């Protein structure tokens, strides 16, 4: 009903998630570093594409090889055609955190670099393809380097002896770049492959990272349930935001938590807002 029967959608899909972390530091020392990689994939779904003549069903692979591709990456989807990509809708984050512990307080600095494909995962993309015999083939040893812009940076503190404020956090989130505003595969007319328009939380072959219209992950991405046009996609994924939070327990029976977020959104590369939209949330 929400989509008015006019939006693409998936059924019978699966989700795979994985994460791995390393910790550097000694137990009896106040300083340590934690670093890791988180990845997730939507795969194996039946995709329904809306057309003027009704829905067209495309069945993506749902077998043992699909599970393997979801685990290590690779493969392709039924609708990829000549320009093949990884099977499923994959994304992830590089995460690092610095911790410093003292008798009176613990301090933390952390960063989260999110990605939707190789262009943002490694800030590097292969640029030596050639379109030959109806398919893209690797022909040259060329690479395209992307600047690191999209990131979440945060700092927190835990005060062990001050009851009025036990914990404080501040975070900065930037998602406007998305590997740039251009995506094009190499053709005889266009000599470079540019892997921009990462379009966070959206996917050309899947409705994106949501469940019943609610975003799976960062709540600053405007969930599809709030769309007024019936589309099951994220219409605002390019933004800059700040978040702060405080908590404490002045007495044994009084505990509090205060949070505030400010966000400026630009929409998406495909459908930018005419002017930035700003939002302030308090809780």
Q: Which residues are covered by each model-predicted region?
A:
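C-terminal structural cap/anchor segments
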Residues: 177-273
């Amino acid at each position: 009903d929400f989509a008015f029967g006019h939006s693409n959608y998936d059924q019978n899909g699966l989700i795979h998630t994985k994460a791995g972390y390393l910790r550097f530091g000694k137990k009896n020392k106040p300083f340590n570093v934690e670093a890791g990689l988180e990845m997730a994939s939507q795969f194996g779904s039946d995709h329904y594409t809306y057309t003027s003549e009704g829905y067209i069903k495309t069945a993506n692979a749902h077998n043992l090889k699909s599970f393997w591709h979801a685990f290590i990456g690779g493969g392709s989807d039924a609708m990829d055609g000549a320009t093949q990509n990884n099977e499923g809708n994959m994304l992830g984050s590089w995460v690092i955190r610095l911790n410093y512990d003292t008798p009176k307080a613990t301090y933390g600095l952390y960063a989260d670099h999110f990605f939707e494909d190789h262009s943002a995962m490694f800030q590097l993309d292969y640029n030596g393809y050639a379109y030959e015999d109806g398919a893209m083939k690797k022909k040259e040893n060329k690479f395209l380097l992307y600047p690191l812009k999209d990131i979440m940076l945060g700092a927190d503190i835990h005060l062990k002896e001050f009851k009025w404020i036990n914990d404080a956090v501040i975070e900065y989130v930037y998602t406007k770049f998305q590997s740039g505003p251009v995506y094009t595969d190499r053709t005889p007319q266009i000599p470079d492959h540019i892997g921009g328009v990462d379009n966070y939380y959206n996917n050309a072959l899947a409705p994106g990272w949501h469940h019943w219209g609610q975003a799976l992950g960062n709540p600053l991405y405007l969930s599809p349930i709030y769309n007024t046009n019936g589309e099951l996609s994220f219409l605002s994924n390019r933004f800059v935001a700040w978040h702060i939070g405080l908590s404490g327990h002045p007495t044994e029976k009084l505990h509090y938590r205060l949070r505030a977020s400010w966000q400026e959104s630009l929409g998406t590369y495909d459908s930018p807002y005419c002017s930035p939209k700003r939002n302030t949330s308090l809780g």
